[in-house]
Each structure stands twice: as C-alpha cells, then as structure tokens.
Amino acid sequence: IPVLNVVENMTLPVQMDGRKVGEERLQELLKLLNLEDRKNHLPNQLSGGQQQRVSIGRALMNAPAIVLADEPTGNLDSRNSQEIMELLKLSNKKYSQTLVMITHDENLALQADRIIAIEDGRIARDEVIRR
C-alpha cells in the first residue's frame, strides 16, 4: 500500500483484525526479511525485491498454516527471484507452514517438494520431488 511504510504494511492484517501487533514477531520478520534498516521507508523508496519481501512479511504476520503465493517472483530478476524463493522455503521450514505457489518458472517449481502441473484446467502431472 503506497502510503504506508514497511512496518505499517506488514502489520496491516493484524490491525484490521483488531488484534495487538506482536512486537517480537514483527522484529523477527523484519530481521528474517532483511528489512530492519528499511522499516520506516515507503514502498516507492524500496527496490522491487524489497517490496516483494514486505508483501511476504504481511502474509506471514498472522503466522498462517498455509501461505498462498501467486507468482511471487513474477516481476523480479533471477537474483531477487531466488532470494524470494529462499525466504519462502525458510518460512516453510522454520514455521512449519505449507506453501502453495503458483508459478510459470520451471526452475522455481523444481525447488518444491511436490509439483502439480495444470493444463487446460486439469491436473496434467502430480509428482513428489525426491532429493
């Protein structure tokens, strides 16, 4: 949201739900997302990768059991895309969250534990990735 700084953007869902923002959770996410030194910046003062990390922070603020990520790296270069993917994987492991990600990027999809490919509205492939 363009008129809100990083902290305000990340805590918006908690505040809209009428709950108190957990300062410890906020600080943990700011550190995890490498946004501690940018917490008072507005979106137009952030890079595309930083803006995407703010969005991830907003999604993680409520500690959901399932994170839905629709093209989370769609507008990012390959370096920032990989950074975002690493953050999502870390969140998956650290907080035991299920990550459902929609992507057209085969390289990102191959980093998943399971791939379900959909073609013409039907499941074309469903496979568990063994490492």
What are the residue ranges of the model-derived segments?
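ABC family nucleotide-binding domain
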Residues: I1-I118
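Conserved beta-strand-loop-alpha-helix hinge in the C-terminal portion
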Residues: R122-R131
